[in-house]
Amino acid sequence: REAFAERARALLKVVGLAGYEDKYPWQLSGGMQQRASICRALVHEPELLLLDEPFGALDAFTREELWCVLRDLWQQRRFTVILVTHALREAAFLADTVCVMSKRPGRIIATRSIDLPRPRDLDVTYTEPFIDIVHEMRERIGLVRRS
């Protein structure tokens, strides 16, 4: 039990929540709650982390900040992440591979490798290669939606 408490404190520090260990969720902002959720998932040191729209309810600045938190945690711990998102920029920034799914029933209909170098800084989101990837994914999704 003490080992988990120590890991939890270390994770909270990494995500910028040191000093908030004894707070209730309702006492935290949305971004802080999301950071705590990521810590809760990682405290058991999983090999696989499934995230379903983890940043969708956050404002743009907090969302991008948490992209970087997740990026940094991944760099340190090297777990596999399956990220379900409708945010194309988020997918292109965080992923190594993006899968586009069909309408119901959901099936993978396209796969795109993201060959941008790591670690990715937020500045990459303003580069032509990044923008091209996002536009390509948007086109593929548009084809799916129109079919």
Please annotate each region the language model reported.
Residues 103-133:
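Conserved beta-strand-loop-alpha-helix hinge in the C-terminal portion
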Residues 23-26, 44:
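Conserved signature/switch motifs of ABC ATPase nucleotide-binding domains
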Residues 78-84:
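Conserved H-loop
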Residues 49-52:
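Catalytic Walker B motif of ABC-type/P-loop ATPase nucleotide-binding domains
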Residues 2-20, 72:
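Conserved ABC ATPase "signature" region
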